[in-house]
């Protein structure tokens, strides 16, 4: 039993990334570019789907939700990482740490559910094309999305409440760049058995079951595609669901590499690199995968935006000018710190 006079900690120290001091500014510029690209790319996908009437379909409603989730998921960890990379005291208050853990769980699990919903869309579109509009009605799509948000809220709230009841009284150094659930459990000085069981049980429901559903839907999709006699039908099917399969592989590939590899192969550097891939890089690549490999995203938005001159100008500014301004700012930042180090 914990002693009453034992001091309770009020903040944690985030060790951050295992980067050499001379490489700090280079990686800061790299992560800043990744974060800005993630924000602009996913925001552009959301705006394009909203403005183009040809994309007002269940599949693209799910895609806009996925882009919003990617945008928010990166914003949970990347700004704090960038701040701590330029700070001499990379601390985070206990309440802020719980909030970061909550939103990290929320948007991570939400993406898993959204990928399952989108896989179901692809499955119906390819395996039952004549009944697609009947099965995937707007009401059905909205119901699946609402269920995903509700289940995600319950999952993140449960873990956060269980974490809030724990006591942290000794070690307050987190060997990570964000407040990860498993890392916080190792620092607790009270009984974490309930948290461990809930994490094991909920992890199976939240990750394993959606992953199995994705595997089964992909297997049915591939078998249906292989039975299509015409080359045009195969190309259309891959154009519809090829980007989604790429995103699924990227998302679950990083999770498997981070959490499901043999424990003997785990080390801090490897786990940190995989966590950066999981929290930053995958969400940056998602809008590019959907835009470059999906014919609807490449074709119809351009035709629609030509009739919206104001937004067309806005698009040119976002895509063309802002990256140049960001690049100039990054170069100036590197030169400033380089001159200080030389002096």
UniProtKB/Swiss-Prot annotation:
Gene3D superfamilies: Rhodopsin 7-helix transmembrane proteins. It is found in: Cell membrane. It comes from the Eukaryota. The chain crosses the membrane at residues 29-49, 108-128, 142-162, 196-216, 243-263, 272-292, 311-331. GO terms for molecular function: G protein-coupled olfactory receptor activity; olfactory receptor activity. Disulfide bonds join 97-179. Keywords: Cell membrane, Disulfide bond, G-protein coupled receptor, Glycoprotein, Membrane, Olfaction, Receptor, Sensory transduction, Transducer, Transmembrane, Transmembrane helix. One of its GO terms (biological process) is adenylate cyclase-activating G protein-coupled receptor signaling pathway. Glycans are attached at residue 5. Residues 50-107, 163-195, 264-271, 332-343 are cytoplasmic. InterPro entries: GPCR_Rhodpsn, GPCR_Rhodpsn_7TM, Olfact_rcpt. Belongs to the G-protein coupled receptor 1 family. This is Olfactory receptor 1E3. The gene is OR1E3.
